C-alpha cells in the first residue's frame, strides 16, 4: 500500500479554541464579530479541505480507525432484529463502530440534492463552503444554530412550575431574573433570553420588563444577544413582542463547545445534507441472514450494483464465518484513485484486510475477497469480466440511486444525467439493472433492494412499487420488506410521514429493504 493515505483523519482545527468556541462566548459577540468569525471559520475549512482533502467533519485518526474496524468481525449483529409496535420486522442498529468508513470517501460532502426534476436543486456542503453566494445564508444558519440555539442543542427553556427547573415556581420572568442577579443562581449555568418557537410554557416577561432590566444593568449583552426582533442584541430599541415567539428564559451549562452540534448548520440547515452511508454492520447482518442456507459453500458471490460510499463492501469484509466474494460496481469517478490505479472500494477493503487483526493474522485471520467494476449497472452485462458471473451470484443487495434525489458527481455516466425524467430512468436504468441482477442470480437465492419513494415538489415517484412490479414480472417471489430504522431527527413530526413507524410509542423514520426470492 502506498505511503500516502487516501483517507482523511481527525480535523484538528475543531480542537482550536478560536474555532470551537464556547457557547457563552458566542453570546458575548456582537453581531459583526459573529459574522467575521463565521467568515474566518469558513475560510479555515476551505483551506484545510483543499490542502488535505478532509471535509468539515471531526473524524478520528488512523489508529482509531483500525481500532473501530477491528470490532466489526466479532460483533454479534443478530441483536439488531426487533419488531415495531405494529409487530412488523425491523432492523434497529445505531452502532457507530463503522462510522470511519466515511473518511475513505471524502466526495460524500460534494454530493448535492436534486437533479433536473428539481426546481431548486440544493447545493452540496462543498458548494456551501466554497461559493461566496452561499455565505449570507450560511451565516444566518450558523447564527440560528448557535446564538439562537434553534434546535435546543445548548440550552433549555425554563418551564413554568417544573420542579426540575431552577426557580420555575416564580410568577414572572422579571422576578426570576432579579433573583438570579441577587445571587440565587444555578451553579455552573448562565441564562439568556430568546424569541423562538416553543411549545413550553415559560415564565412570562414583557418587552418593557426586558428593556427596563437592560437599562438598569441587570441584563448584559450576553443575555439579550438571542433576541430576534432586537437584531440579535444590536438594536434593543427595535425589540417588540412576537405573538408566536414570546420572550423566554433559557438556561445553559457553561463550558459547552459549539462543535460538533453546530455542524447541523451546514449538514441540514441549508436544505442540503451529506450523503448517507449504508451502515456496514446492517449490511453484515443481511449478508449473514440471507446466505445462511448456503453458509458452507466454498465461495458466496455477492453482487452490489451501486456500491455507494463503501458501507456494504466494509460489511462484506467483516463477515468471518463464511467465505464472501464481494462484486461491486459504481461509475463515480470521484471514487477512483488514479495514483494507485484502484478504486476507493478496493483501497478500503485492502485496508481492512491488512490492518485489522481478525483479517490479517496469518494463523487465525479470516479474509474475504472482492472485485470492482466502474460502469453503469444498466450496462454492466456488457463487461467481459462480469459476464463470467452469469448464473453464479448467490445474493444481490444494493441501495440504488433514488432517481435524481442525489447528485453523486458530474460524470455523464451518472444515471440522473443519462435519464433526465423518471419514466426514462425507470425504463433505461432501473429495469435493465434489475434484469441483469435476476439473470445473473442463481436459483434459490435472495435479492434485497433498498429503495424508497421520493417526493419532488408535489409529485411522488413510485420507486418502491415499480421495483416490486419489475422484479415480480421477472419471476421473483416477493417475500416482504424489512424496516431499517433511521436515526431520529430533532424537531420533526413523523406521525404522518410515509415510511414512519412507532417503537415503544416513539416515531422513527425507516428505509424499506424489499426481499425477493428466485425459485
Where are the model-predicted features located?
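Class I S-adenosyl-L-methionine-dependent methyltransferase catalytic core
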Residues: 1-70, 74-80, 84-519
Amino acid at each position: 500500500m502506498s505511503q500516502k493515505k487516501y483517507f482523511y483523519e481527525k480535523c484538528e482545527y475543531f480542537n482550536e479554541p478560536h474555532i470551537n468556541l464556547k457557547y457563552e462566548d458566542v453570546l458575548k459577540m456582537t453581531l459583526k464579530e459573529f459574522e467575521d468569525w463565521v467568515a474566518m471559520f469558513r475560510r479555515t475549512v476551505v483551506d484545510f479541505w483543499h490542502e488535505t482533502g478532509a471535509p468539515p467533519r471531526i473524524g478520528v485518526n488512523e489508529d482509531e480507525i483500525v481500532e473501530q474496524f477491528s470490532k466489526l468481525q466479532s460483533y454479534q449483529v443478530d441483536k439488531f432484529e426487533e419488531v415495531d409496535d405494529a409487530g412488523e420486522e425491523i432492523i434497529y442498529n445505531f452502532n457507530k463502530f463503522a462510522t470511519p468508513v466515511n473518511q475513505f470517501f471524502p466526495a460524500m460532502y460534494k454530493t448535492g440534492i436534486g437533479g433536473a426534476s428539481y426546481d431548486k436543486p440544493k447545493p452540496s456542503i462543498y458548494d456551501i463552503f466554497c461559493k461566496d453566494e452561499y455565505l449570507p445564508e450560511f451565516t444566518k444558519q450558523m447564527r440560528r444554530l448557535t446564538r439562537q440555539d434553534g434546535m435546543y442543542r445548548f440550552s433549555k427553556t425554563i418551564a413554568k412550575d417544573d420542579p426540575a427547573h431552577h426557580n420555575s415556581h416564580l410568577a414572572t420572568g422579571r422576578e426570576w431574573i432579579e433573583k438570579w442577579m441577587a445571587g440565587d443562581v444555578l451553579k455552573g449555568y448562565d441564562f439568556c433570553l430568546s424569541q423562538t418557537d416553543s411549545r413550553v410554557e415559560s415564565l412570562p416577561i414583557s418587552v418593557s420588563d426586558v428593556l427596563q432590566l437592560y437599562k438598569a444593568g441587570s441584563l448584559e449583552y450576553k443575555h439579550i444577544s438571542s433576541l430576534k426582533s432586537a437584531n440579535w442584541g444590536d438594536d434593543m430599541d427595535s425589540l417588540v413582542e412576537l405573538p408566536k415567539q414570546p420572550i423566554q428564559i433559557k438556561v445553559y451549562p457553561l463550558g459547552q463547545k459549539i462543535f460538533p452540534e453546530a455542524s447541523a448548520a451546514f449538514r441540514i440547515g441549508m436544505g442540503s445534507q451529506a450523503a448517507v452511508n449504508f451502515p456496514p454492520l446492517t449490511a453484515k447482518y443481511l449478508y449473514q441472514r440471507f446466505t445462511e442456507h448456503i453458509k458452507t459453500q466454498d465461495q458466496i458471490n455477492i453482487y452490489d450494483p451501486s456500491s455507494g460510499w463503501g458501507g456494504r463492501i466494509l460489511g462484506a469484509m467483516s463477515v468471518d464465518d463464511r467465505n464472501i466474494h464481494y462484486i461491486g460496481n459504481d461509475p463515480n469517478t470521484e471514487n477512483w484513485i488514479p495514483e494507485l490505479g484502484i478504486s476507493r472500494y478496493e483501497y478500503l477493503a485492502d485496508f481492512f484486510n491488512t490492518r485489522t487483526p481478525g483479517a490479517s493474522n496469518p494463523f487465525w485471520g479470516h479474509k474475504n475477497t472482492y472485485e470492482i467494476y466502474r460502469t453503469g449497472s444498466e450496462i454492466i452485462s456488457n463487461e467481459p469480466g462480469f459476464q463470467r458471473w452469469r448464473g453464479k451470484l448467490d445474493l444481490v443487495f444494493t441501495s440504488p440511486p433514488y432517481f435524481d434525489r442525489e447528485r453523486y458527481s458530474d460524470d455523464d455516466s451518472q444515471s440522473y444525467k443519462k435519464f433526465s425524467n423518471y419514466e426514462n430512468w425507470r425504463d433505461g436504468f432501473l429495469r435493465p439493472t434489475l434484469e441483469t441482477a435476476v439473470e445473473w442470480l442463481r436459483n434459490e437465492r435472495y435479492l434485497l433492494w433498498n429503495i424508497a419513494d421520493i417526493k419532488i415538489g408535489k409529485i411522488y415517484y413510485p420507486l418502491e412499487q415499480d421495483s416490486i412490479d419489475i422484479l415480480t414480472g421477472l419471476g421473483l417471489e416477493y417475500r416482504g420488506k424489512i424496516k431499517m430504522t433511521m436515526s431520529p431527527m430533532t424537531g420533526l413530526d413523523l406521525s404522518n410521514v410515509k415510511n414512519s413507524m412507532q417503537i415503544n410509542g416513539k416515531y422513527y423514520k425507516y428505509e424499506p429493504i424489499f426481499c425477493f426470492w428466485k425459485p
